[in-house]
Amino acid sequence: MDDDLTEYAPDIPDNVLELIFSYLKLQDLRNCALVCKSWHRFLSDENNEVWRAQCMQKLSPDAFKTDLLSVVPTYKAKLRAFFHAWNPYDCSRHVYIKPNGFTLHRNPVAQSTDGSRGKIGFQHGRHAWEVRWEGPLGTVAVVGIATKDAAIQCHGYYALLGADDQSWGWNLVDNLLLHNGDAHGIYPLLNNAPKYKVGERIRVILDCDDNTLSFEKNYEFLGVAFTDLPDKVFYPTVAAVYGNTEISMVYLGPPLDG
């Protein structure tokens, strides 16, 4: 930015900044936040008109017609969740992403296990996202993580997520942890652990610093599920077998401890 403009940047009124920033792309907004403290302060308000406008431009009106985004209360957080949502180009051919951008629908195809990955993978930091299953689970309903090398569709009804060394999953049907084709015990470690009920909120917590994967159900921490994860890029992933089942995923950002 020109030195003369930088000198006067802190003195630009908020209403003028709002007008200027409303014409910028997201990457430009990120750069603007680095110009001066005043601009950083303005853009740190995740509910201001600039973020609202960006949110309305990028998200479908269908995304606001449900309570899915209630877990990400600010406009900037909703926008971030959209960019982390299911990838329509990285899912089984029997799956399509609904107009809201956050929910996948598995078509009623017999003898097929079908999955989907999120748009963005993680190799560093701590990340959390919420998964909600709508419709019957069938014999396989697995939630977890996978690399780009993991299969996303296979013939038959099979615990695809966790079937190889590139994926880790929790089968909500029988509460088994799955990796590399093996069951790694019941989860959570409770006597007669309750089964997942359709509509309950599952929170997936990936800690790339400690190399662990954990889960919460209805805001109750269930414990660490997997440890010693390799240094790879992991994507939010699910695998399903039941026809017309729908699975929503909302990225939350870093998990809140406590």
From Swiss-Prot:
Q: Which domain of life is it from?
A: Eukaryota
Read off the PANTHER family from this record: F-BOX_SPRY DOMAIN-CONTAINING PROTEIN 1, SPRY DOMAIN CONTAINING SOCS BOX PROTEIN
Query: Subunit notes for this chain?
Result: Component of an E3 ubiquitin ligase complex composed of hiw and Fsn.
Sequence similarity? Belongs to the FBXO45/Fsn family.
Q: Which GO terms describe its cellular component?
A: neuromuscular junction; SCF ubiquitin ligase complex
GO biological process entries: negative regulation of synaptic assembly at neuromuscular junction; neuromuscular synaptic transmission; proteasome-mediated ubiquitin-dependent protein catabolic process; protein ubiquitination; synapse assembly involved in innervation
Pathway it acts in? Protein modification; protein ubiquitination
Q: Which Cys pairs does UniProt list as disulfide-bonded?
A: none
Q: Where is the B30.2/SPRY domain?
A: 64-256
Q: What is the predominant subcellular site recorded for this chain?
A: other
UniProt protein name: F-box/SPRY domain-containing protein 1
Q: Is DNA damage set as a keyword in this record?
A: no
Q: Which UniProt keywords apply?
A: Neurogenesis, Synapse, Ubl conjugation pathway
Q: Where in the cell is it found?
A: Synapse
CDD domains with a match to the protein in the record: F-box_FBXO45, SPRY_Fbox
UniProt xrefs under SUPFAM superfamilies:
Concanavalin A-like lectins/glucanases (SSF49899), F-box domain (SSF81383)
Q: What does this protein do?
A: Required in the presynaptic motoneuron to down-regulate the levels of wnd and restrain synaptic terminal growth at the neuromuscular junction (NMJ).
Q: Which residues form the F-box domain?
A: 6-54
User: Pfam families, alphabetically?
Assistant: F-box-like (PF12937), SPRY (PF00622)
